[in-house]
Amino acid sequence: MEDKKNLKTGKKKEKVVKKSEDARMMEQLDNKVREMETEFDLNEHLVIDLGNAYTKIGFSGEDLPKEIIPSLYARNKMFDKKNEIGAFDQKMDVFGYEATEPQYETDYDLFHLTCGDHKEKTSKEYLEFLKDALENKMGLSTGEYDVIVNISPIKNEDNIRAYGRLFIEDLGFKGLAMINSSSLSLFATGKTTGVIVQCGEKRTYTVPIYEGFPLYHALNKARVGGRDITDIFKAGIIENQIAIRPGDIHTLRQVKEKTCSVPVDFDYNYYLDENNKDIIKEETKLFKLPDETIVTIPRKSRILASELLFDPTVWDNTKSEFGLIKLIAGSIKKTEMIDKIFKESLVENIVLSGGTSMMEGFPERVKNNLNGYKDEDFDLEYEPIIDAQINRNIGKWIGMSMIGSMSSFDKLFIKKQDYQELGEERIAEVSQIF
């Protein structure tokens, strides 16, 4: 009897111990959750994705940007710059959507008036574009905010110094943090390892990333992007005797996104054969311009335009740029010597990013071309998995918003006082960019 009694008592003790262990585990879990929650900062930082096509502006911790503005600048054609005489109700310079209106002459290259092509100084026009967006469109006082901006995957000290002048000296932000754009779209997916395929307005990059750190030795790039495709569209529409103004660039981008399709398996001769019955039957693509004009998008422009990314020689046989698939495979190949398991992680986490990747059929084409990819001394081996998020056109901004909402990010800001003490020459040394 005593043995039975002791056995029951022992079981009760085991239950009590188990309950206390469970309670302790739950308490530890709750503490961990609270730690994670406190990791997010209640202070809002301004987040700006400086895109070639569109500038996205919003606040850290939010899901979407407050403003997505075409990176356009225009001058009033009726305004006499020399004598500064113009209609009292008209502006001399306008930006964003307003720059697409017919009375203005749009400068297509607004973004490149800043760091990239003009390393010595930030242009007056680009500064005014940002002032208009921040102060007039969003009603913000820049001196009240720290700002987070993205920089090119290729770190350039001239650009970093130019951003210091632009955001701290000229715009008066109280702090500046710069994040390498290569990692941002990956963070937006919740991953830390993978290959980013960034298809931007003027460049295409492929960058392998391991545990959040870009492997720059394996970065590949091509001077081909969305702008080139848009220009092909423009040429095709002009062939159809439709007049296009410089300010219609925003509309042309919309035409590209809504009518351009990427064949999963491309055959150049097949798509150019005017007598091909399958092609003739293919649905005609129409698009309504803002002035109500209906335009027919030529098949050559609609289908061959996107091929520029996969084979730049289709439109210009003198181009020496590699196509997108070779860029991706080449980046993975450069990391193969590190670790075979790492290679598998990269192949199974290929993340598409950028507005140009939004074209119909784009993810399927990338997967189809990579599947079974081999060259003379490289075999992809594993089946590629393509991550094509529905909001990948704003993936960089989302990544910055997520990172900027963490309280630990605060230490990465270069404060205005520190900048003034150190000077612009040392900003590249002290800026913590990842």
PLM features per residue range, with description:
Residues 39-166, 175, 205, 216-218, ...:
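Conserved phosphate-binding loops in N-terminal lobes of ATP-dependent enzymes
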Residues 210, 214-318:
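Phosphate-binding glycine-rich/basic clefts of nucleotide- and phosphate-handling proteins
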Residues 126-137, 300, 305-345, 365:
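Phosphate/ATP-binding catalytic cores across multiple sugar-kinase/actin-like superfamilies
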Residues 245-257, 264-274, 280, 379, ...:
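Acidic, glycine/GT-rich loop-and beta-edge segments that sit at the periphery of enzyme/chaperone cores
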Residues 150-160, 264, 347-369, 392:
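Glycine-rich phosphate-binding loops at beta-strand->alpha-helix junctions
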Residues 174, 178-181, 345, 367-398:
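Conserved phosphate-binding/catalytic loops in two-lobed NTP-binding clefts
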Residues 23-40, 169-197, 239, 399:
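Conserved phosphate-binding catalytic cores of ATP/NTP-utilizing and phosphoryl-transfer enzymes
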Residues 40-41, 47-54, 189-191, 196-205, ...:
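A short acidic Gly-Thr/Ser loop motif
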